[in-house]
UniProtKB/Swiss-Prot annotation:
GO molecular function: acyl-phosphate glycerol-3-phosphate acyltransferase activity
Primary site of residence: membrane
Organism: Mycoplasma genitalium (strain ATCC 33530 / DSM 19775 / NCTC 10195 / G37)
Pfam families: G3P_acyltransf
UniProt-recorded name of the protein: Glycerol-3-phosphate acyltransferase
Chain's gene name: plsY
């Protein structure tokens, strides 16, 4: 196999596996198991927060965990293929300039959650799936965003507002080269202290994360209107 073929397989596998995994909507799966359609109650969104409203905190928490796992597992599969299969066909120079393409699986997983193949392309808002993707990409991103999300949720009691603010903050911290420490490919703990990412890798993440942020804000347009009018459901109103 030549290098071009190896890179093509990496890109195709990343996008295909990520999208197919992301298309698994666990809120809909629990709907079938519990014989109660989450899309017919509450906000009608097949996501973790509405699952808490409809099915209770335990089921909603499971939906959040499973949705987040999609984003992480999609990357993990791609990383295994790349690390133990395709990498051997690449020179060191080509490897250093292409390994980050593995993270296309994270992008594809979020798109799959929003536009799922198995559910007529009508999915959720990809908050938890994005969280799982961040855990796969950079622990700094994940921890910063998790702390911000928890803080805003506790202060305002609005999960939707916390999610939107967190997405906005992430759109900014992506630009900080010291924070996007791609630990799956940089396993030396000491390197995390002096780490600084390449500009083209930062651009890569911006090119898919910034448009995703716009999509997520659009999907939350009804939530934004309800927040402005003081009609958005608070987390204290969950079961």
């Amino acid at each position: 196999m030549n290098q071009a073929s190896a890179i093509a397989i990496l890109v195709i596998f990343s996008l295909a596996s990520g999208y197919l995994l992301g298309s698994i909507i666990f809120a809909d799966i629990f709907s079938k198991i519990l014989k109660k359609n989450v899309r017919e109650f509450g906000s009608k969104n097949p996501g973790a927060t509405n699952s808490m409203r409809v099915f209770g905190l335990k089921i909603g928490f499971l939906v959040a965990i499973f949705d987040a796992f999609k984003g992480f597992f999609a990357f993990l599969l791609t990383w295994i293929l790349f690390r133990f299969g395709l990498q051997g066909y690449l020179t060191e120079k080509v490897y250093q300039s292409t390994y980050f393409l593995s993270y296309l699986s994270c992008f594809a997983a979020t798109i799959g959650h929003i536009f799922p193949l198995y559910f007529k392309f009508k999915g959720g808002k990809a908050i938890a799936t994005t969280g799982g993707s961040l855990l796969a990409i950079s622990l700094w991103w994940f921890l910063i965003c998790l702390l911000i999300w928890i803080m805003i949720t506790l202060i305002t009691k609005y999960v939707s507002l916390a999610s939107l603010i967190t997405f906005f903050v992430l759109a900014v911290i992506i630009l900080i080269p010291w924070l996007d420490y791609l630990y799956f490919f940089n396993s030396d703990p000491l390197k995390s202290i002096t780490y600084q990412n390449e500009w083209y890798i930062i651009l890569f993440f911006c090119l898919w994360y910034w448009p995703l942020t716009v999509v997520v804000f659009w999907l939350h347009r009804a939530n934004i209107i309800r927040i402005l009018h003081g009609k958005e459901s608070k987390i204290t109103q969950l079961n």
